[in-house]
Amino acid sequence: MHTHNNFKTPSDADELDDLDDDMVIGVIEEIAQEALVGEDESDSDIDEHDLADMEAPEPNQNADENESISSDSSFDPNAEDSSDSDDSMLEEDEAEGASSGEATSAKRRKDDNDGPCGSAGDSAAFDLDDLDDETDETVRAIIAAIKKPRSAPPEIKLEDFITDVCFHPDRDIIALATIIGDVHLYEYGNEGNKLLRTIEVHSKACRDVEFTEDGRYLLTASKDKCVMVTDLETEKLKKLYETAHDDAINKLHVLDENLFATGDDAGTVKLWDLRTKNPIFELKEVEDQITQMITNDQKKLLLATSADGYLTTFNIAARKLYVQSEPYEEELNCMGIYRGSSKLVVGTSKGKLYSYNWGYFGYHCDMYPGIKSPVSLMIPITDRIACVAGEDGNIRACHITPYRNLGVVGQHNMPIESLDINTSGELLASSSHNNDVRFWNVKYFEDFGDIKYNDKHNAYKEKRHNLPSSKCTNASDFFSDLTKEDEDNADNNDAAAGPSNSA
């Protein structure tokens, strides 16, 4: 509190007598003057608009009133001044407080009526209404996309590296093999995926996982040189082929409910029967890793590709070599059967696709340039369409005989490790080095017509074209929408103009 030197608290009657009335009145007037100055300084922050809102008089108006008061002839300097009393000062303070309270409440009522932004709030609301009208179609499109049902299951993400995936032949179950030797069984669906169980099968990396044709057993091959057969109903081990190979097993192929074949890193191929302990036969015709094995519906021939560039064919019934191809200066990584089992197509590490007539596997009859990046995986989608994938992270569809790039089915951020398709041929699953499994609905390939040899095509655009299952869109789709909109506007203008009345 600010103190004044002229104002003293009397301690006795003598000091009280020393205080005259003029001194007391002067001190009171000084305190009142400072209070008024403080109020003026606090009110100086209010701008002219706030003064108008509080119905305060304008500065010029105050000046005029002061002049009129000073020029009033009725003013008597000798008249008794009632302002010297304390009671009159209190009444003036109460009157000022009441007037300021009324002004504040009036301003508060005006602010409540105008909203937080006053008159600007109305213009802002108007702009938002215009914005809503302009973006109405975009909002509707976003809502429709959110409400649109999924056409494929969501992504599955694991902590461990996924080495292989395999669909169950009868149920909506997919098996995921991992680098730590475990197998995860998931029940998949468009609404979500559910982990059914995790089976610890191998002490080292599980490189391949397959179901038997009847779906009763799960077969796994591992780097620990073992093959394990697990009963899915009881989750118990049915059979263990310990040290099935002298080297790490890389590939496993199921022929039927009893027969299966295995291939290791040293090029040895063995054929097994679940009803026996020992292999039916064993052949070693190459010196490098077996990359894939396959057979047709007749199951008379077993074909194997290897990393040293050979396509080797075994006669199952005779248990001997049928034919071996000429060596290629590139790795043969994958293969598929097409055209009613009349064509075999092999993918290589240089991105090429070699075509063979069935039964004549000594040398290819045709060669396609492919995608110019290593083709590590191949899955037949239809009798004439294949999906290939590799290190670039893209899954591409191509037409076989004649060869055409159809476009991109799906994408991963890292190289793709495995591919598989379900029994109905509608759902494709892929895993990548990012420890994820993605699903792609490829049912639209059923509507693809056959391609003729003399059909005109643009190879550059076909290689980069995104198919319906892809998560990316084509730049041409944006302009096609604009063209469609222009055509609709033109039709509306023609309809509004009406038919021409010619004389």
Swiss-Prot record:
Q: Which regions are annotated as WD repeats?
A: 157-196, 201-242, 244-282, 285-324, 327-366, 411-450
Q: Which SUPFAM superfamilies match?
A: WD40 repeat-like (SSF50978)
Q: Does the keyword Repeat apply?
A: yes
Polar residues bias spans: 59-76
Q: Which InterPro entries match?
A: WD40/YVTN_repeat-like_dom_sf, WD40_repeat_CS, WD40_repeat_dom_sf, WD40_rpt, WDR55_POC1
Write down the Pfam families for this protein, in alphabetical order.
WDR55
Coiled-coil positions: none
Q: Where is this region: Disordered?
A: 1-131, 483-503
The UniProt keywords, alphabetically, are: Repeat, WD repeat
Q: Where is the composition biased (Acidic residues)?
A: 12-23, 37-56, 78-96
Check the record and name the PROSITE patterns matching this protein. WD_REPEATS_1, WD_REPEATS_2, WD_REPEATS_REGION
- Annotated signal sequence is none
Q: Which family does it belong to?
A: Belongs to the WD repeat WDR55 family.
- Give the protein's recorded name: WD repeat-containing protein 55 homolog
> What species was this sequence derived from?
Drosophila pseudoobscura pseudoobscura
